Every structure is written in structure tokens, then in C-alpha cells.
């Protein structure tokens, strides 16, 4: 059974956005002071405290450097304390990127250049912020490694004939590897498998030779069938005098229709029959 290449992402810690955070006494004092400052500076402070995220975005909020209880906010309006809280917006829309052409040595020792396109999105905004610095860039780098690992265990024939199956297997492996980063890989498409020029010429010559051999076989089979038909017709004509007469009339008719300027002198069929009988003897 053929082993498949697997790619594992670095282990990441588990984040529970609903776990309550226990602040120190100093942290609680700073928090209370910040709330009082915002309260006494209303309504001016409202311009700095109210933030908006779009339908396709989520906001991950940090208070005093720690993840705020409740998970990501959005879509809509949310409230932050400028002095002690910060936030980061995460786009949840599907993103696509091209994997640069990768030089890969196949299982049967053929060097090919393969490029692909990856479609992914952020499925968990909180995890993508906490566990990885740049989820998009990390996914791109991991996709290149996954492409090389998977295609390195395939033959050239499998790469050319089983693109869909390889793409689905790559998508499953890449999705599993990026799950700790809060990334969902939606689709993987192998765009092109480019062969060396010399190999392309060799494959073209082989295909041309195969077509020529097939044409010769078909021609030989046709000649064989025609020879059998002629032999059967000769047997029928030899055993039936009427068949000779009918064939003679058919030949005269075809000659007169094709060449109207040709003068035909009919030849007695009895003499033809004598020639045929003498030839058969």
C-alpha cells in the first residue's frame, strides 16, 4: 500500500474565549480608573470607545494584554476602553492564492513543475490571532510543503490522470494541519503539471507511433475482410452460371454510367465461363 505524505502544523495551545480572566489588584485598579475617565469625558470619549466591524469581519479584543472574555465581537458596534483595551480585525472571507511552481521529483524519477491554487478562510478569529502570527502567510508556506510531499509519492501517470483525487487528499491534509490556526481550507486545485521539453517530445513520438501502429492494424484487418469477401464471391460465381451473367451486366452498367464516351463491345458470357472453368481446372 502506498504511503501518503503528511504535513503537521506546529502544536498550538488551546484557547477558550469564554474562560474568565483573573486580573491582579493593579489590573483591577487600572480598569476602574479607565472606566471613570471614560464616564467623566462623555460624550467625547464615545468617539474613541465605539467601534464598528463589517458583516464579514470579527474583532478580537485584548484587555491589559490578555484575551477579553466572550470571544470575538461582531458584526456591528462594540465598545472598548482605549486606555486598557486593544483589538484586531479579522477578515472571514475566502482568500485565494497561487502556489509558486514547485520542482518535484516524482516516484518514477521524473522532474516536473507543478503549480496550484488554494482557497481558504479564517474559521476561528480568536484562534487565528492567538496561535499564529500571520495565518495567511503560514498557510501559504504550508501549502507549498504539502504539495511537494504529496506529489513526491506519486508517479507521473498518477499526476496526469488523478488530479482531482490528489487535490481532494491535499485539501483534507492541509485542512487538518491548519485547524490549530483557526484556518479552514475550502479547496485545492492543481493548475498545471509541466513536463521537461525532452520528455514531451518523447511522449509525442510514442503517441504518434501508437497511432500509426493502430492504423496499420485496422488496414490489415480491412484487407483481410475484403479478401474473404472476394473469395466468397468467387465461390458463388463459380457455382452459379446466373451469377456470372448478373455480374457481367452490373459491370457494363457501371462502366456506361461513369464513362459515357467509351464504346463497349459485349463479350459472350459463355466464353467467360469457359475461361473461368479452365482456370479453376
Swiss-Prot record:
It is found in: Membrane. The keyword Transferase does not apply. This is Stomatin-4. It comes from the Eukaryota. InterPro entries: Band-7_stomatin-like, Band_7, Band_7/SPFH_dom_sf, Band_7/stomatin-like_CS, Stomatin_HflK_fam. It comes from Caenorhabditis elegans. Belongs to the band 7/mec-2 family. Keywords: Membrane, Transmembrane, Transmembrane helix. The chain crosses the membrane at residues 28-48. GO terms for cellular component: plasma membrane. PANTHER family: BAND 7 PROTEIN-RELATED (PTHR10264), STOMATIN-4 (PTHR10264:SF131). It holds the Pfam family Band_7. It is a single-pass membrane protein.
